Amino acid sequence: MLFRSEEWDFDGYVVSDWGAALETVENANGGLDLEMPGPAKNWGKLLKDGVDNNNVSIQEINNKVRRILHVAAFTKRFDHPEIKPESSNDNKPQRILLREAAQEGMVLLKNENLLPLDSNLQSIGIIGPNAKNAQIIGGGSAHLQSYYESHPLEALKSKIGNSVNIKYSKGCHTYKYLPIFNENLIEADSSKKNKFLVEYFNTANGGEKLISQEYELRSKFWALEGFAKDIIAKEERPDIFVKFSCAYTPDVTGIHEFEIFAIGKSKFLIDGKEIIDNWSNTEPGDAFFALGTASKKGTANLENAKKYQIEIQYKFEGNFPAIYIGCKAPDKVDLFNEALQIAKEVDQVIMVVGTNSDWETEGNDRTDFNLPSQQNELIDAVIDINPNTILVLNTGSPIKMPWIHKVKSVIQTWYAGQEFGNALANIITGDISPSGKLPSTFPINIEDTSAFSSYPGKDLQMNYDEKLLVGYKWYDKKKIKTQYPFGHGLSYTKFKYSNLAIDELKDDLISCKFTIKNTGDFSGAEISQCYVEHMIDTKSKPVKKLQGFDKTFLSPQEEKEIEIILNAKSFSEWSLDKKDWEIKKGSYKIHIGASSEDIRLSNQFNL
């Protein structure tokens, strides 16, 4: 790894992603300094064996130790060896900042006079699986515990509920995995309501010796969130057996569905009767970084108000302890038809649809370009009944939009954090004009994407066949029509671009000056984008590349001169021979636009 010292001037150490250090000697000689997480799996004794067998030099080990100690000294770890608890702040300035960040990241994709909301509306239907419980943050390592969560339904009720009659329906479920047990319906014992009793047994020598117990309630029990961290992580973990138990009292009669999967073996019992066997015959699944078993489900016809004894048995086998336990009771109403009835009764509909942290997370890819479950059907049906429908997309990435031709307004909100609902309410009511721009291209079909022809590859290896044509450059070069291009984003006002002037400055700098005027009636911000096109057409190089942008806030009828400065790197290419950036002389075009496709101004010059 000479590049880290010679090219990057980097004097830190290299750490693996969690569980990614799959080899011993190859990683050691390839520049890895630290395998994570502990305890060591492919290093430790195996690395010592590599040194003893002369496959890894002691000098290599010394260099790794030296780099780790250097960082420890640099961060003053030796002066303060104690592990301090994590901390964060929750105060008014930070809440305001989080709300502003959420607002400015939301992208208005389409608007045919439904937004901002008409203040004279008498009734609004808020429909969709993400309206009451939105996804505010991604799954896996992206997940953080927030101080509070603001969701669209509650935020809109708080903002306009006194003047507008609001009706709500979930419309449909979007589970990838069945939800957590209803905490109000379970109890470990009379003194421990709302939780499972979790018992750990040591099965060595043929017995079941209770070694620890705790009370917990969640659907996903795994080591990365503290499950069994002081028990199964020890050397005796192959002998550990875990039992989850509780009394469950349904509040509805009917077919209940249950689900389990784990890293290891698991089974699900009700009143001693086995409902799910994921123990005797397991298959690989995609959960827990594709280390767990495939999901298995079972059903039971349960009676309202009758108490049942639930027991889940788990035997750890694998990289780290993890098990998922889900339960879905039958719906008390027909959610789909309830939503359609509301759509008939109201002046306007706000639909909040999307994904969740099970669909969009680290460790596995989405398997479908569509919205999960019945959401596309729900959108179509609601719009057919009430064309005055605003669609809010609560997703972390692009989705297929088969209904886009008939929906009038669409907002892409992403996973906007703990102020999500409040930020969305400000956008919808017009307190804030949207100003976000797409950081990626939204394709029409999955077949249009650059990775489609090479994904998923073979034996976990995939070639990046698009080479330099990453992202919007692929669609640009291949002349592929997009649903919404990179950089796209509307406002409640209009902006006029004019007077592009290009000047060469000293130190290989290029000045791009132009004027933007707010020609509408709303105050708003515009993100102008500067693309550079080298006027030499080749099959392998992009048509143009984004090299600068500017965000400008303008009051109605206000105009400002914008200047974007481009440096030498904007006109350079990486030289494999020189191992450095090399300025390419010749003819260039500067394009100024509101997106990668919506180019407003262009000018040519020679460098």
What role is predicted for each listed range?
Residues 173-348, 357, 363-366, 370-377, ...:
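Acidic/polar, compositionally biased interaction segments
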Residues 1-2:
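Short, small-residue-biased leader/transition segments that mark boundaries at the very start
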Residues 565-594:
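Short, surface-exposed ligand- or partner-binding patches at beta-edge/loop junctions that are enriched
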Residues 39-42, 49-51, 55-138, 144-217, ...:
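Secreted, periplasmic, or luminal enzymes acting at the cell surface/secretory milieu
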Residues 252, 264, 318, 432, ...:
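Short, acidic/polar linear motifs in exposed loop/turn regions
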